[in-house]
Amino acid sequence: MSHDHNHDHEERELITLVDEQGNETLFEILLTIDGKEEFGKNYVLLVPVNAEEDEDGQVEIQAYSFIENEDGTEGELQPIPEDSEDEWNMIEEVFNSFMEE
C-alpha cells in the first residue's frame, strides 16, 4: 500500500463541494491516498476550511473515493460504502500514520 500526501500547509489545496440543495462548502484537501493497487481507486480526506473544533478539539473530516480520468485529472468524488471495512481500515491506518508525522 502506498500513499501520497502534502505536508506543506502554507500551500493549501482547496476544493468546493456542492450539496443536494446547491450549497457550496470550501474544503481543504488534507490527504490523498493511492488505493489503486488494492481497491482500484484513490481516496481524499477533506476538512472544511472554516471548521471549528468540538469540545474535544476534533474537527469533522470527510472521506471520499475517486477514480482518475483517462487524461489524469481527478474524477468525480464518490462516498465510501459504510460496510466496506477493508477500505475504511486502510484509510484509518494511513490517516493515523499521517497524524503521527
From Swiss-Prot:
Top-level taxon: Bacteria
Pfam families in the cross-refs: DUF1292 (PF06949)
Family in the record: Belongs to the UPF0473 family.
NCBIfam families noted in UniProt: PRK13678.1-2, PRK13678.1-4
Protein name: UPF0473 protein SPD_0182
